[in-house]
Amino acid sequence: MRRSRVGNASLLRRIGLGVSTQTESLPLAVLDFVGIEYGENAAASVAGAVGIARAVEAAGYRRYWVSEHHNMTSLACSAPELLIAHVGVQTSSIRVGAAGIMLPNHAPLKVAEMFRTLLAMYPGRIDLALGRAPGTDPLTAHVLRRGKVVDPGAEFPGQVGELLAWLGDGFGEGHPYSQLVAAPVIDEQPELFMLGSSQYGPKFAALNGMNAAFAHHMSPDLAFEALRDYRASFEPRSPGDEPYSAMSVLAFASEDEQAVLDFEAGWTLTIANLRRNIREPLRPEQVRELAGSEQFRSRRTDDGKMVTGEPKFVAERLLEMKEQAQADEIVVVTPSVSRDRREASYVALADAWRRAA
């Protein structure tokens, strides 16, 4: 007997599976890279991630997501499924998930087993966003894939199809995997999103009736058109299914102008370091030096790549961007700044969002 279909938000909403039960949650999420601050260890970073998740849950955010990155001494997010489990037990209502799981790095069966286990632990609260990028450098990707040469463009659709089959779509009669199951066997599925920072992800999501999540923080020039096209070209997997999208945006909200400058300088340094293959945590004095330089201050422009400033301004601008992209949710990305300042920014933004919406 064919297993139930999965992968679209509206079907899951109709049957009450895989969606938040928070009727008053905001259409806001947090994407956390679980950064390791200078001078601290990974244990402190993971504990800090729990603190952030609990703070944004209390502030009314709908989701808390962690990323998958490898070979980064400045990040503690190489095993997002474990972070989800750790955060899940110390929160009560916010949805927790990965944004994403880089599917070419993993066997689809193993991903299905991990997320079914998470759903058994935290029913109705687990999200799974899928990506096709490696989340790391080429050599690390080679090791993760045990030397297998992967062509994501050619192989990714098949990997997604296999994952959906393990999660509930089922394999066709006579398929060699049709007698196997992804254990534990449960009646619930994670809420699925397809990640993208190019046209590929939203197009794939539209053609396959999936939720879409676009990384404005990586490709700001493509985001709005890509998500509008996704909504216009959405093909439902089942009658009545509707498009559902989220857009991640670099944002920092504070009344403190120096804190805003530090965030902008920190992100500028992070990008510069990545281009030079420097993966260590930022030194606070580096950030202060850049933020205090006249050259940096004079070059600050409102180029649309990030939204920073007083909470009222940030909330109003994000609402405008949400409408412009025809997105259902905004995913806030706030790296390269101290955890205390991140938490304060998230809380201030939520308060300002309620007043502005």
Language model features: what each stretch is:
Residues 2-94, 357:
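N-terminal beta1-alpha1-beta2 module of alpha/beta enzyme domains
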Residues 28-32, 64-66, 96-98, 126-130, ...:
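Hydrophobic faces of well-ordered beta-strands that scaffold small-molecule active sites
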Residues 28, 60, 68, 87, ...:
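Conserved, mostly hydrophobic/aromatic
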Residues 22-23, 84-92, 119-125, 206, ...:
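Acidic (Asp/Glu)-rich catalytic clusters
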Residues 32-47, 101-108, 186-196, 302-310:
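Active-site mouth loops of central-metabolism enzymes
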Residues 23-42, 104-171, 212:
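Flexible, glycine-rich active-site loops centered on histidine and acidic residues
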Residues 202, 206-218:
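A conserved active-site cap/scaffold subdomain adjacent to cofactor or substrate pockets
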Residues 12-22, 149-181, 222-327, 354-357:
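An alpha-helical appendage that flanks or caps ligand/catalytic pockets
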